[in-house]
UniProtKB/Swiss-Prot annotation:
A motif (WKS motif) lies at residues 44-46, 75-77. Residues 272-292 are cytoplasmic. The keyword Membrane applies. Belongs to the tissue factor family. Its main location: membrane. One of its GO terms (molecular function) is phospholipid binding. This is Tissue factor. A lipid is attached at C274 (S-palmitoyl cysteine). SUPFAM superfamilies: Fibronectin type III. The gene is F3. PROSITE patterns: TISSUE_FACTOR (PS00621). It is a single-pass type I membrane protein. It comes from Oryctolagus cuniculus (Rabbit).
Amino acid sequence: MAPPTRLQVPRPGTAVPYTVLLGWLLAQVARAADTTGRAYNLTWKSTNFKTILEWEPKSIDHVYTVQISTRLENWKSKCFLTAETECDLTDEVVKDVGQTYMARVLSYPARNGNTTGFPEEPPFRNSPEFTPYLDTNLGQPTIQSFEQVGTKLNVTVQDARTLVRRNGTFLSLRAVFGKDLNYTLYYWRASSTGKKTATTNTNEFLIDVDKGENYCFSVQAVIPSRKRKQRSPESLTECTSREQGRAREMFFIIGAVVVVALLIIVLSVTVYKCRKARAGPSGKESSPLNIA
């Protein structure tokens, strides 16, 4: 009599782990298929309200459409079916720089120019929220002019233009931020490295310096009320020059001498003509008569 056949029971750690591993692999494949070409790493790049949304990846088999909205508005589509990985949203965010904006990037498989057959609900990725007034970076300021006269140094910062409009006119950075915008001046003797600072909520500085010393300086835009992105990069460094100051003084001295000389000449000619005009009639009356 043959012995009964024993039932083969899977050993722990063999068939079950294989099943789990297979399920995990299928899940990873499904995830990869779902995310291939889908936009990610959405980033706002904004300076002085010039605002661009960037994302990844640079795909050859997907195109993208960007949508933007505020918290109370419907989505508005921009940059339709673009193969690029950036979209300029400046014209939308400058409408109200105090609003908070949200954007999302929809991903579509490329169709060689054929826009039919796209899914009604394509995969998309949301951006972080963006409030232009709080989140745009301050651009590098420019020193418009400077002059050192004696113990006074006057520095004027150029009022940068933005793409924010009011009544059809582009506003300056000062017009947008008002007194929230400060400038810090860093200045030092050209012969030393010890820096001093001055701050103003206008675009001009007038500071006391040592007479006869050259000074170097730079400026930086600051919004103290912000929690982040408070400061701009520093401007290019400018320096005064005693030679320039002396040349300016000589120019004014020479100009004054020329003006005085011209006045003397004009007065002399005028006096001469007046005397000649007076002497003419009297000379005729006193001349003897010619008797034939």
